[in-house]
Structure formats: C-alpha cells, structure tokens
Amino acid sequence: MVKDIIKTVTFSCMLAGSMFVTCHVCAAGSVVNITGNVQDNTCDVDINSRNFDVSLGSYDSRQFTAAGDTTPASVFHVGLTSCGSAVRAVKLTFTGTPDNQEAGLIQINSINGARGVGIQLLDKDKHELKINVPTTIALMPGTQTIAFYARLKATYLPVKAGNVDAVVNFVLDYQ
C-alpha cells in the first residue's frame, strides 16, 4: 500500500510538471524587434598623432615661487583624417596617472623626477583639461587638426629639480 501511494504521488507530480511546461510553452508568443543605424561619424587618427613626444623645455626650480605657478605652454596637435559626413563631435579623454597633490594634473613618472610639479593639459583656448575626464570637441567632416597645450604647474613648494617624464594616452568616443 505504501508503495502504491508513493508511485501515485510521483506520477501525479510528473504529470502536473509536464502540464505546466506544456502550457508555458503554448503561452509563449513574444516578438523581438531589432533596430539599429549605420552612420559615417568616425575619424581616423593621423599617423603622426599616434605616438609622439611633447617637449616642455627646461626651467629653474626657483622660478616656481608659489603653488599654482606654471611654465609657458607647449603646443601639440592631434590630427584626425577621413572624418565621416555624419561626424559632429567626439568626447576626447586624456588618460594617465593623476598627480598625488592635484588629481587633474599628470604625475611625473621618473624615479629621479621633479617633485612639486605636475603636467597640466590645456585645450585650444588654454582652458584646463583634467586627466581621465572626457571633454567634448566639435568636429566637421574631412580632415582636422586639434591643438592642445601642456605645461608644468607647481603643486607645492619647494619644487625639486629632476626629470619630467609621463605617458599619456587619448581615447576618442564619437557622439
């Protein structure tokens, strides 16, 4: 008798489970619409803008008399070619290691590097660009050259003399 009850219960559960699965499958009737758009809104980075050096020059550490003092800015360019007909803007982010004293600046990497200064990046109008923070730049179809500037900025005194080395990458995110 106990065996019969167990068999019956087991069979009933399997039957009920099969009915549930069958009904669930019968009720499924979804539609997935997939849409998209192919645009011509990107550019190629000019070969001369892929790997290059920016010289900031040589300065006496004593010329920095207060935190916030800067050197003259050195211009550099990022060239974009073959910008598509739909291009309007790009979010450009300079990425690198932020300075320990002022997070918007780039940290000097050298073991024997200068101390008390960081590298500041500026846009074409010489407004500060913070490292690792995107900035939107208007673009037009075709070829264009975007000017940027780099300079040293004192973060604390006294500034210690040494080498100035840093690696910065840039990332383009088209809008």
From Swiss-Prot:
UniProt note: phenotype after gene disruption: Deletion decreases hemagglutination but no decrease in fimbriation levels.
Disulfide bonding pattern of the chain: C43-C83
GO biological process entries: cell adhesion involved in single-species biofilm formation
UniProt entry keywords in alphabetical sequence: Disulfide bond, Fimbrium, Signal
GO cellular component terms, A-Z: pilus
N-terminal signal peptide: 1-27
Keyword RNA-binding: no
InterPro entries for the chain: Adhesion_dom_fimbrial, Adhesion_dom_fimbrial_sf, Adhesion_dom_sf, Bact_Fimbrial_Adh_Pro
Record localization: Fimbrium
PANTHER family referenced in this protein's UniProt entry, alphabetically: FIMBRIAL SUBUNIT ELFA-RELATED, PROTEIN FIMF
Role noted for this protein: Fimbriae (also called pili), polar filaments radiating from the surface of the bacterium to a length of 0.5-1.5 micrometers and numbering 100-300 per cell, enable bacteria to colonize the epithelium of specific host organs.
Family in the record: Belongs to the fimbrial protein family.
The protein's name in its UniProt record: S-fimbrial protein subunit SfaG
Lineage: Bacteria, Pseudomonadati, Pseudomonadota, Gammaproteobacteria, Enterobacterales
